[in-house]
């Protein structure tokens, strides 16, 4: 086993797609814009919620209603991010095993900071996930290594003996930029072929398989 496990959040630990799509479509409808399908939203996520809305809103950042629509999304999502969101099957058991073995664990997400903190505290608590880093104005988001470096600093450890776990190409690039291996999960927002095309080397089909991957 590794010494330190850094996890992505959406599509890796938590199934968040339905709540993200609901808030996205609420904001779009509120501003007279066409709705997006669940599959479209699945493709839009991974680079933070601002990028999600940039992709969902017609003409993106050039739309004069972009800022209002984005704020409508944020406000709705903070009220509704627990409506259907839940850990994937096997995630809680896997995190408890890591805790039992004395492993260091953090979450590093491109989800905005307040939502990352709220969701991690609600579902996992400080015992299972003592460090949770979300998107903030003062630090570059993934795939830049900055948020991973900050998580390692808060865990009082280094990239040596650490592994990054995620469900997307952004996570593969983040791991590479952070100088650590990546475990790609197959239950998230991207499929196996997509992950392999983007450089995935270690793939797992269930959370408990993460525990079996050796350094």
Which residues are covered by each model-predicted region?
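Active-site neighborhood of HAD-like aspartate-dependent phosphohydrolases
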Residues: 1-43, 54
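Alpha-helical elements of Rossmann-like donor-binding domains used by nucleotide-donor carbohydrate transfer enzymes
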Residues: 22-26, 51-55, 72, 93, ...
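Short helix-capping segments at alpha-helix termini
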Residues: 29-35, 59-64, 100-101, 124-128, ...
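A metal-dependent, Asp-based hydrolase signature
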Residues: 47-79, 96-97
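Asp-based, Mg2+/Mn2+-dependent phosphohydrolase catalytic module
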Residues: 1-3, 39, 113, 117-215
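Short, acidic loop-to-helix structural element flanking the phosphoryl-transfer center
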Residues: 79-107, 113-117, 145
């Amino acid at each position: 086993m590794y010494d330190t496990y850094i996890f992505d959040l959406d599509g890796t630990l938590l199934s968040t797609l339905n709540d993200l799509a609901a808030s996205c479509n609420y904001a779009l409808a509120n501003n007279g814009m066409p709705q997006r399908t669940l599959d479209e939203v699945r493709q839009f996520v991974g680079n933070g919620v601002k990028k999600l809305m940039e992709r969902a809103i017609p003409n993106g950042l050039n739309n004069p209603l972009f800022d209002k629509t984005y704020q409508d999304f944020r406000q709705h999502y903070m009220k509704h991010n627990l409506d259907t969101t839940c850990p994937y099957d096997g995630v809680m058991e896997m995190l408890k095993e890591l805790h039992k073995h004395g492993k260091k664990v953090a979450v590093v997400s491109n989800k905005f900071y307040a939502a990352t903190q709220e969701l991690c505290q609600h579902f996992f608590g400080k015992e299972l996930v003592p460090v949770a880093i979300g998107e903030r104005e003062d630090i570059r988001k993934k795939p830049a290594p900055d948020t991973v470096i900050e998580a390692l600093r808060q865990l009082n450890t280094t990239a040596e003996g650490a592994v990054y776990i995620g469900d997307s190409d952004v996570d593969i690039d983040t791991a590479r930029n952070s100088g650590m291996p990546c475990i790609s999960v197959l239950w998230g927002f991207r499929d196996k072929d997509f992950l392999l095309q983007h450089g995935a080397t270690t793939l797992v089909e269930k959370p408990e398989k993460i525990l079996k991957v050796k350094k």
